[in-house]
């Protein structure tokens, strides 16, 4: 016979057991953000698609932010997965979404408004906000001069925040925020006169100004600010703490400085006249020799754009030139080098380019195995200019000074010492104009950057047509010089 009284002890037991399971479940902690990243084996990062942050060229993914965050992923022992945001609002929206990016590495500047959305890491790069105008037009020099100008900035940027604050003091300031453009587009619009002014950070201008010969800095809008990575405001501290430890480490061991040098250590070497002249020659001279650069580079397993950059540095792509020291031709080969590389006529552009390619490839092959890319390329270029003997002397000086003889950032500091008696008197190969290879390499790196940029359609959108290289500003009349470059 069923008895309700007999059921009570059973129910009590079940309630106790169920309660214990619930308590045990509550005691199991949710894995931290860092633990989830390591368990998944993937670091999901959101960034911007721009030359200063992340882009893809024929060699794959690249960019300052990409290289830095790739090192962080490698440090964690996980795969890096990059997502690109359509605009800044999209970037912040993606951050922290379920199964979405856990980190934003996009050259972000911290601000009080942004701190309501995200938390920022330790800083890793200092930049200055700059007002940009077109050469030949009236140059603004103060915030009040922004009144009445057609200004456009990135929507959701700290530059928009700055303009909003200025508008409180100068109500006549009007500006447009756009989520359909990137920094490159804003600079192009100033260059072509579509807008009067824009605001960009100094690092992005430095990387892009050479492509836009007409743009100038009007004035700095405020003090320098720091760029940082960002994580979602609601996340725990685990990933942010790991990021900060990583950034502190790469700052101390020199990795961060070498990365800065790779991307920003050569960007200001051309100046206005050099940039404009190179842009002209890119269209007028390069087409005559492009097939030879490509063929010789393929033969020697080099990047044809690097080889072309060397040719421009040597002769400005002129085939029949002779220097006062006797080097001749498009690649400015010495008689001995020409003979060694099988060049019978140094003034024949095809032979000259072939000889230069063989010589550069030969130098790269002879370098110390401890020198890795990209430093290996910069060392080879320096040796192409000053000779392997003097380069070895500079490496030994670097080692004596406690620097790394296998890093271009360190060795380029030693090369100028080869022209100072107190230093070259202690070397095997003696005096050299050691400053020349430093400038030689810096110029070639800049020319190479431009050649890479204009041969990548995705970087310039519809401006670059297949087989028809375009450099902004090239087809325009040379702008007036009454406003000197800053």
Curated annotation (Swiss-Prot):
Pfam families: SBP_bac_3 (PF00497), SLT (PF01464). It catalyses: Exolytic cleavage of the (1->4)-beta-glycosidic linkage between N-acetylmuramic acid (MurNAc) and N-acetylglucosamine (GlcNAc) residues in peptidoglycan, from either the reducing or the non-reducing ends of the peptidoglycan chains, with concomitant formation of a 1,6-anhydrobond in the MurNAc residue. This is Membrane-bound lytic murein transglycosylase F. Keywords: Cell outer membrane, Cell wall biogenesis/degradation, Lyase, Membrane, Signal. It is found in: Cell outer membrane. The keyword Zinc-finger does not apply. In the N-terminal section; belongs to the bacterial solute-binding protein 3 family. In the C-terminal section; belongs to the transglycosylase Slt family. InterPro entries: Lysozyme-like_dom_sf, MltF, Solute-binding_3/MltF_N, Transglyc_AS, Transglycosylase_SLT_dom_1. Residues 27-267 are annotated as: Non-LT domain. Murein-degrading enzyme that degrades murein glycan strands and insoluble, high-molecular weight murein sacculi, with the concomitant formation of a 1,6-anhydromuramoyl product. Lytic transglycosylases (LTs) play an integral role in the metabolism of the peptidoglycan (PG) sacculus. Their lytic action creates space within the PG sacculus to allow for its expansion as well as for the insertion of various structures such as secretion systems and flagella. Transmembrane segments: none annotated. One of its GO terms (biological process) is peptidoglycan catabolic process. It comes from Pseudomonas fluorescens (strain ATCC BAA-477 / NRRL B-23932 / Pf-5). Residues 464-486 are annotated as: Disordered. The active site is at residue 314. Residues 268-486 are annotated as: LT domain. The lineage of its organism: Bacteria, Pseudomonadati, Pseudomonadota, Gammaproteobacteria, Pseudomonadales. The N-terminal domain does not have lytic activity and probably modulates enzymatic activity. The C-terminal domain is the catalytic active domain. It is a peripheral membrane protein. CDD domains: MLTF-like, PBP2_YfhD_N. Its EC number is 4.2.2.n1. Its main location: membrane. GO terms for molecular function: peptidoglycan lytic transglycosylase activity.
